[in-house]
Every structure is written in structure tokens, then in C-alpha cells.
Regions:
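An N-terminal assembly and electron-transfer interface module characteristic of large anaerobic redox
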Residues: 1-293
């Protein structure tokens, strides 16, 4: 990344663009039949400009023929070659819910499991099972997710464990660095090697945060009422699914954080909900949630 992107550019951009270039340099791909896809938040964060930095880096690296498509919900890069459809968006949301639940349960079981690797094997089992279901065009409706959540929780609860006191460490931060072992120097592996239980707040919280901010902009600055109504309706649907996931988690004897609608209330009086560059008020909210939880 540093070879083709200015070093003053934010850390995640250097890593993400570096990963793209590393893949192209690997020799594993037919470069005349390869395209890149990168997300754009559409907010004030420089992440909205990663796509332009990536295109410049490709030219400098000798890959001007490789197109870059944008994945965003803000109307940016409308002609980039990739369009998010409603069916695809519903599947993506389902994958995020399932992924959050698997990660949360795995992290609460792995430090205490009697048989090393049992929690990771259970994750692999459910990833394979859910993959088959989703590829068959099923498993992504609210009804299907609400049916599946208790089954996942039940399987993890059945893993034999020995509960002993351990240090619990919550991790918050910039969205890429928080989850990427490359970005955070494999923080989770290190903490687990120190006999800690690690808690990473889920990705769905960030998704809801982005949606909420679109509606909050209407409250703070005006604009189209339809946007506010649309985001409220979408958040209500996500809240319904999220509460079912959290209930299944708690019913199986695991720790479940509060839903997003409760998370929004936690930073009030500490930081404005209009502070939304990067992860903004979400960082404060997640820290409060982890401390109180």
C-alpha cells in the first residue's frame, strides 16, 4: 500500500489497497478477466475516496485495465458496473446476522471448551450449512432467520465447557481495523493466548449505525422526509430480527448485548448523535455497552 498510496492516507486505505495489489501480483488471477469491488460509505470519512485512491494505485502499479466497482447505498459511482439489488441486499443482511451470532457464540465458548477447537469446528459446520441454504435461495427471510437462531445457539450451548474466571476484553474501533487480523496485528489471537475472553461488537451494529445516520441527517439538517421514513422502517425490520437473535443467544445461557435501539440511547449527554465521521458516536456507545454488560 505504501508503495502506491501517500503515507498520510489513513491506515485502513493503505492496507486494503495493499491487499488488492498483493492479490493481483500473486499470479493467481487472469488479469484481463479480473475486476475489483470496494465498499464506499458515502459519509465524510476518507473511506468514501478509497475507490479513487485504488484506481490511481492500479495505474501506477501497471494495471490500468482492471476495473473497480463500488458497493454503496449512497448513490455514488452509479456507473461503476455493480448494482446492489434488493434480493442480494437481503441475503447480505442475513449473512451479517448469522456471522455476528457465530462470532459472538464462538468467542464465549472457545476460552472455556474442554476439547480444544470444538467451537471453531462448530463455526465451520454452521458456515457450511448456512452456505448451502443461502445458495439454494433460502434462509434469508426474517421468519427463516428467527427459526435458525435458536438452532445455532443450542448447538454451541451443547459444547462441553469448564467455566472458570477469565479476564474479559471488549474491542471497539475503526470498522476494518477492528475485525481484520492484518489491521490489528492479530489482536484476538494475542488476547486469547493470554487466556482472555474477547468480545467484538457485531457488524450489524455498524450497518444500523450507517442507516440511522441517514435519518438523523434529516433531523439535524432537513431534507427529504421520505429518507427519514424509509430508514425508520428499515431499522424497525432489522430490530425485529436482531431481538430474535439476541433472545436466542440469551435463552441458551450466553451474554447478549442490548439491541441497537437501546445502544443509540447510551451516548446521549456524552457525545452528539451528529458526530458520525468514521465510527463517531458508535465507539462511545459500544464502550458503554461493554462496560455495563
Amino acid at each position: 500500500g505504501l508503495k502506491y498510496v501517500h503515507n498520510d492516507t489513513c491506515y485502513p486505505a493503505l492496507l486494503v489497497i495493499g491487499q488488492f495489489l498483493d492479490a493481483l501480483n500473486s499470479g493467481k488471477y487472469d488479469l484481463d478477466h479480473t475486476a475489483l469491488l470496494i465498499t464506499q460509505t458515502g459519509g465524510g470519512c476518507r473511506a468514501s475516496n478509497y475507490i479513487h485512491l485504488l484506481r490511481k494505485a492500479l495505474v501506477k502499479a501497471g494495471y490500468p485495465q482492471i476495473p473497480v466497482a463500488s458497493l454503496n447505498f449512497s448513490g455514488l459511482e452509479k456507473d461503476s458496473g455493480f448494482q446492489m439489488t434488493l434480493p442480494l441486499a437481503r441475503r447480505a443482511l442475513a449473512c451479517i446476522f448469522y456471522g455476528d451470532m457465530l462470532c459472538a457464540l464462538r468467542n464465549q465458548v472457545a476460552p472455556y471448551e474442554n476439547e480444544k477447537g470444538a467451537a471453531d469446528r462448530m463455526v465451520d459446520l454452521w458456515v457450511e450449512r448456512l452456505g448451502r441454504v443461502l445458495l439454494a435461495g433460502k434462509g434469508f427471510t426474517a421468519r427463516e432467520m428467527k427459526h435458525t437462531f435458536p438452532l445455532i445457539a443450542k448447538d454451541f450451548a451443547a459444547i462441553p465447557v469448564t467455566r472458570v474466571p477469565k479476564v474479559k476484553v471488549g474491542v471497539v474501533g475503526e470498522i476494518y481495523v477492528k475485525y481484520s487480523p492484518l489491521g490489528n496485528n492479530d489482536l484476538q489471537k494475542f488476547l486469547e493466548s493470554q487466556d482472555c475472553e474477547v468480545n467484538f461488537p457485531g457488524l450489524m451494529g455498524f450497518v444500523q449505525y450507517c442507516i440511522f445516520n441517514m435519518g438523523e441527517d434529516h433531523v439535524l439538517y432537513g431534507g427529504k422526509l421520505a429518507v427519514k421514513m424509509g430508514t425508520d422502517q428499515l431499522l424497525n425490520w432489522l430490530d425485529s430480527v436482531e431481538r430474535a437473535m439476541l433472545k436466542a443467544t440469551a435463552d441458551a445461557g450466553f451474554y447478549a448485548p442490548g439491541p441497537f435501539k437501546e445502544l443509540v440511547e447510551k451516548p446521549r449527554g456524552i457525545i452528539s448523535l451528529g458526530a458520525k465521521m468514521g465510527e463517531g458516536w458508535l465507539l462511545t456507545a459500544e464502550m458503554i455497552e461493554l462496560v455495563q454488560g
